[in-house]
Amino acid sequence: MGFLEEEGRWNLSFSGAGYLGAHHVGATECLRQRAPRLLQGARRIYGSSSGALNAVSIVCGKSVDFCCSHLLGMVGQLERLSLSILHPAYAPIEHVKQQLQDALPPDAHVLASQRLGISLTRWPDGRNFLVTDFATCDELIQALVCTLYFPFYCGLIPPEFRGERYIDGALSNNLPFADCPSTITVSPFHGTVDICPQSTSPNLHELNVFNFSFQISTENFFLGLICLIPPSLEVVADNCRQGYLDALRFLERRGLTKEPVLWTLVSKEPPAPADGNWDAGCDQRWKGGLSLNWKVPHVQVKDVPNFEQLSPELEAALKKACTRDPSRWARFWHSGPGQVLTYLLLPCTLPFEYIYFRSRRLVVWLPDVPADLWWMQGLLRNMALEVFSRTKAQLLGPISPPATRVLETSPLQPQIAPHREELGPTHQA
C-alpha cells in the first residue's frame, strides 16, 4: 500500500470547518473503529481552525462522546439564543477556551509536541506559520485560540501567541501539507480531498484558495453558511454521520476494510471480481502508491435507515448530545408561541442583556487591556508612518523632465529638423 506499509510515513490533515467540524469527528471515529492504524501510526496530525480541535482530541485520546457533547453542546447554546450569533451572549472564543482549560490533561503539551501541527495566520501580513512545539499546556490552548479566531466574527482584537498576533489559520493555509502525497486530507466540503462528501451535481468548476481546493456549487455555499450559523442540532449531527460515511468510502476504495459495507447499505450486491479478490477492478492511479476502486458507491445519510447498526458508539453519542431539556418550560420556549413571545419581549430584555454580557466580557478583558492597548497604539503608529512616508514620496519625489512633444508630419510635407546650436569656433569672412 505504498506509504501506508511503513508506520510513521503518513500524515493526517484536517481543514477548517467551523461548526462543520462534526464531519471531522465522524471521520475520525470511522478511522478509529475500522482502521486504527491510520491514527496510531500517523507521523503528524495537522489542523487549522476547528480542524485543529479535532487533531488535539486525537492526540490526547478523547472519546467520540466527549467530542460530540462539547461540539453539539455549543450548538445547543447557540440554538437557545434568540438572535443566534448576533446575541450579546455569544462568545465562541471564551467558551472554547474555558472548555479546553477544563478538559485538556496537564500533560497535553507533551502529547502534542512533535505530533500536532497547528496552522496560524500572522496579523497583519497574513503569513502562515505551523506550530509543532508547545512549552506548556497554556501555550497549546493559546495556539488553538489563535487558529480559531475568525476576524470580526469572534472579535476585533486578535489574540496573542509568543509576542505576536495571529488569526484563523484557514485564512492562509486551510489544509496543511495537502500537496504532499503521503498526507490523508479531510474536509466537509465537496472537492478533491481524500475524505470529503461527493458532489451529486455535474459541476466541474473548482476554486483553489488558501491551499485548499473545493467545488463551486450550491451545496458548498450552504455548507459555508452552516460553518458559521448552524441551523439546528440535527443538521450538525447528520454532518457528523456523513463524515463517518465519507471516511468509510475512503477506506473501501483503497481496500483497507475487510468487507464492502457500503454496498449493503444501498441494498446492492458488490460487483463480482474476476479473480475472486476484493481489490479487483481497481484503478491504478497513484497517490503515494494506493490503488483506487472507483466502483465503491457514494452513500448519504438519508440512504442509511438505521445508522446505529453501522456505528453504535457514534449514534449513541449523537443522540445523547442532541437531547434537549424535556421540561415543560423549555418545550414552551422552543414552540411557536414561545418563539413569538421571545421576539416580542426583545425590546425590553435586549438592552439589559447587552449591558450584562458586555460588562462581564469587559471584566474578563481587563487583564489583557495593557497589552492590547499597546498593540493597537503600535498598529496605529505604523499605519500613520506608512501613510506619511507614501505621501512624502509622492510630494517630494524626483522631478521628471517634461515630456517631449513629437509632431507627426505628413509624408507629403518635409520634416522640420530640430534646432541645434553649433558650439564650434566662429568663421570670419
Curated annotation (Swiss-Prot):
Pfam family membership, one: Patatin
Protein name per the record: Patatin-like phospholipase domain-containing protein 5
Keyword Cytoplasm: no
UniProt source species: Homo sapiens (Human)
Function: Has abundant triacylglycerol lipase activity.
Motif annotated as GXSXG, chain positions: 47-51
CDD domains on file: Pat_PNPLA5-mammals
Catalytic activity: a triacylglycerol + H2O = a diacylglycerol + a fatty acid + H(+)
One record GO biological process: triglyceride catabolic process
Catalytic residues (positions): S49, D168
GO cellular component entries: cytoplasm; cytosol; lipid droplet; membrane
Tissue: Expressed in brain and pituitary gland.
PROSITE patterns listed in its UniProt record: PNPLA
Gene Ontology molecular-function annotations: triacylglycerol lipase activity
Enzyme Commission number(s) of this protein: 3.1.1.3
Keyword Hydrolase assigned: yes
Keywords: Hydrolase, Lipid degradation, Lipid metabolism
Listed Gene3D superfamilies: Cytosolic phospholipase A2 catalytic domain
Motif (DGA/G): 168-170
